[in-house]
Every structure is written in structure tokens, then in C-alpha cells.
Amino acid sequence: MSYKMSRAAYANMFGPTVGDKVRLADTELFIEVEKDFTTYGEEVKFGGGKVIRDGMGQSQVSREGGAVDTVITNALIVDHWGIVKADIGLKDGRIAAIGKAGNPDTQPGVNIIVGPGTEAIAGEGKIVTAGGMDSHIHFICPQQIEEALMSGLTCMLGGGTGPAHGTLATTCTPGPWHIARMIEAADAFPMNLAFAGKGNASLPGALVEMVLGGATSLKLHEDWGTTPGAIDCCLSVADEYDVQVMIHTDTLNESGFVEDTIAAIKGRTIHAFHTEGAGGGHAPDIIKICGQPNVIPSSTNPTRPYTQNTLAEHLDMLMVCHHLSPSIPEDIAFAESRIRKETIAAEDILHDIGAFSIISSDSQAMGRVGEVAIRTWQTADKMKRQRGRLKEETGDNDNFRVRRYVAKYTINPAIAHGLSHEIGSLEVGKRADLVIWNPAFFGVKPDMVLLGGTIAAAPMGDPNASIPTPQPVHYRPMFGAYGRSRTNSSVTFVSQASLDAGLAGRLGVAKELVAVQNTRGGIGKASMIHNSLTPHIEVDPETYEVRADGVLLTCEPATVLPMAQRYFLF
């Protein structure tokens, strides 16, 4: 005779199941479990008196015989493809299976074999997401990487060489010598890393040199001169060598207007950074570019979401980042031309309708590297409060909105930059770069961060205590962040052309070098999952009002946000 449990008792023991709802942090976002892969009555759970014991939920199968290295039990998966409850099996640093774990000798429907060589991570009552990707990094200081890891990021893409003034302003690692030094430095960090070369040139030779030196992408930045000639040259090299191009356009409209930039792009795929414009770009109407089918638009997190303090902090931030002087009137005018409440408010709505595809940081260069997830979910919460349910929702939940927003910092940047064959989603065969969250701290403070199936970071109590929980509890690197485990648990992405040219042998780095792929004509705005809308955008040159397909886009600034001071008292 089967034993019946109440929903509350079941959720307390094994986590939520189909029909149960979970609140994300202190937001107004509620997700509902769409599917549960378990067999009721056959759930596996680790602990004293629990199921994963020899002859019960643990089989006699060896690793060679098919048992996984790690099982995450009864996890609530939140990804672009769905919100489901499942066990997750990890093997060889990758996601081996999603489904039902246990002992096939004693349990039905098992597709994840637990054996004597299997470690267990308790996922009951936890949320698991793919590791986040930040595709707009100024590599100003190496300490950013630890900050990013502890926030739930597992991949960082961008450019720089340290606190040089070129790096303070632009996401470029200029030249093959600097790129080589950065690839060598990558061995020191538990993080998947990728470096962008400088894309500003009117002749291809120096750009080709950087791609062959390991650049995964090329960055066009106005501070180096983003002219129509440079745009055309850079995209031509990218098309030949299969690397992405990111663009920060000409705020001052010196070499042309947004229409001239669109013409120079010639319909080729390009990733437009901070497409709203506060981070830089044709003033006041660069935001129009988000309606182009070949343009992948993204935001940086200082404008996410629009609040009563957004405008005030931007002026000083901009003056510092772009080497401007408050004593020069032209510099002040340059800065003020980029900061417009109307376009920032419209940016909120364009994210909510899926017209902006990616959210990133702009680390230490008008952006906060540890707040990519926080700012994403604050935007989602603000839009739910102001705009209500999305028309795409099918139940009494926010599942579609959550899937849309999680895609903005996981799968979509991975697709845009040719990394989605390795990272960006929680799918079988991809790298086991995972983040485990307590729902009450979702998006704010992870419970655990895995890189290549190895625990790289987690909050940890006093190491001298008798148990792991006594205060002070703070984030610490774990074993995956040390020694050869570090270099075997993460990778450095490079161009295929650089690998073909023998880069790995020349540099002799410890980390695996993995090539980016499919960054050009095979992708575009339509490839951005849940974020592919291409509305016709108009900007009033006098009032800066933004319209999408004729509809005015405006919203009030937030005065209070979730995931803020309540979580950072200490």
C-alpha cells in the first residue's frame, strides 16, 4: 500500500513538484514547476536513513560501467527551455543526463546511475541554473573574476590588459602580444575566459594578426574611432575568420549618424553594446538599431532597471571612465548627450517585450561585474509590477518572463559569441558550469558554483569550526579553484584560426583552448531565444521619446527595488 504525503510535506522532503510555485528572492516573480522527472515513491535523497545507500538507491555499478561522477538530486531547473524538477547527472565535467537518478537494479525508470564512485549534491528545495555569461568585460583588474564567480558567472568575455587607460574605457586587448599575455594569465583563474581584440582599423592586416593571436572577437569602440571604414573593414575580417564583432558607436556623430552606421554594417551580424546609448553610441537615437534583424542588442547593467537614482550616478561615472574633464565644457556636453531618461525608460520595456536580447556588466567601466544577475531580475520584477503579466504566459505564474530574462545572461550571449556548443544552458553534453541557489537568495547570493563539474566557489563558515556553518560565513574559493583542478575545470576560448595556426603549442598554457564557432551569417537577432523581436523604433530628436511600431515606450523610475539592501546588511 502506497504512502500518501501532503504537498507541504513532500516539498519539505523532496522539493516542489508539478503545480507547486516558488517565489524568486523577494521579487514578485513566481515560477511553477512544469514537469517532474521523478517516479513518485522512488525519489533518491542523500543522508542518514535516506535512499542513496548501498543496495538501495546506490548501485554496484562502477564509473566505467556507467555510473555518474556527481548527482544533483531533486533540483528545480530554471533555463530558457523550461522550469522542471529533475535529478542531474554529471560526468567528465559535463552534463551527462537530466532525469531520474538511482539504482537500476532496484528502481524503475532510472537514466542516471548512482554508484560507489558517485558524489551527491542535495538539490532538494534548490534552484539550478546554467552559469551566467558576461559578454561585456573590461579586464581592468584580475580581482573582478572572483567577484563575478561568487555572483554566479562562469564565463567572462571582453578585452583589456589591466588598468591601462585604453582598457579603462574600451573592451579591447590590442595586438597579439597583449592577447598572448592575457591567455597565459587565464590559467590562474577558475573561470571560462575569452578575449576581444581591437577592431578599429581601416586595413585588415592588424586585425587578422589579432584573430590569429587568439582573439575570439573584435571590438569597435568610438574612443578608437568607429568610422564607417573601420566598421566595414572589421566586419570583413570577422566574416572571413568566424569571430563576432561588438560595436560602441560614435556618440558625437562625427563620422556619421546611426543611419550611416547601419549602412556600413551592410546587413552583417554584429553585437551592439549598450544599445540604449547611456554607455555610448549615436546620440540620441542609437536605440533604433535594435530593430535591425542582423543586430544583436544588449544592455550594460548601470541602466538596469530605470530608477530614481539612475541619471544622477551616470554623469560622474562617465567622466571617469572615458577620461573626460569636468573643467572642459565640450567634455561635459559629450557626457550629458549620452544620458537620457526617455531612452533608459524605453530600454526597460524593450527588454520586457524581447527586443533587447542580452544583459552584461561593463565591469568597472560604467558597470558592476557582480550584479549581472541581480540587475536582470530587478528589471524583470519592475516590469511585472508596472506592466503586469506578459501575453505569452500560459498559467498563473511568471514562467515565460523568467525564461525570457534568464536567457539574457546565459544562452543568448553564448549564441552571440559562438560558445553555445559548450556553455549557456543546462543541456546534456554541455559543460557542467552550474549555479545552485536557495530560492530566497535567487539571483543574489549562490549556494554553490560549479565549473566543469567541480565545486569552484561557495559560502563557507569558520574553517576551524566543528561544522561548516558557524559564522563568519562568506564566499570562499573551493577545490575547483586550485592547482590543476582549476585549469582542468575551465577553458579559454579562442578563434579556430588561431588553433589552426598552432597557438596552443606556441603558448603552452595549461587550460584547454576551445574554438568559437558560428558567429557570423548563421546567427542574427532571430537566434536570440525569447528575445528576438525587431520592432520599428523611432526617436524624437527634440524630446527623445521612443516609439516601437508607433507605440510610445515610457515608464516611471523605480523608487524601491528587490534584491537590494535586504540582502546586503553586512
Swiss-Prot record:
UniProt-listed NCBIfam families: PRK13206.1, PRK13207.1, urease_alph
Organism: Sinorhizobium fredii (strain NBRC 101917 / NGR234)
GO biological process: urea catabolic process
Catalytic residue positions: H322
Gene, per the UniProt record: ureC
Known partners and oligomeric status: Heterotrimer of UreA (gamma), UreB (beta) and UreC (alpha) subunits. Three heterotrimers associate to form the active enzyme.
Cofactor stoichiometry and binding remark: Binds 2 nickel ions per subunit.
A Pfam family per the record: Amidohydro_1
SUPFAM superfamilies: Composite domain of metallo-dependent hydrolases, Metallo-dependent hydrolases
InterPro entries from the UniProt entry: Amidohydro-rel, Metal-dep_hydrolase_composite, Metal_Hydrolase, Urease_alpha_N_dom, Urease_alpha_subunit, Urease_AS, Urease_asu, Urease_asu_c
Catalytic activity: urea + 2 H2O + H(+) = hydrogencarbonate + 2 NH4(+)
Enzyme Commission designation: 3.5.1.5
Name assigned to this protein: Urease subunit alpha
Subcellular location field: Cytoplasm
Cofactors (names): Ni cation
Gene3D superfamilies tied to this protein: Metal-dependent hydrolases (3.20.20.140), Urease, subunit C, domain 1 (2.30.40.10)
Family to which this protein belongs: Belongs to the metallo-dependent hydrolases superfamily. Urease alpha subunit family.
Residues with N6-carboxylysine modification: K219
CDD domains the record matches: Urease_alpha (cd00375)
Domain of life: Bacteria
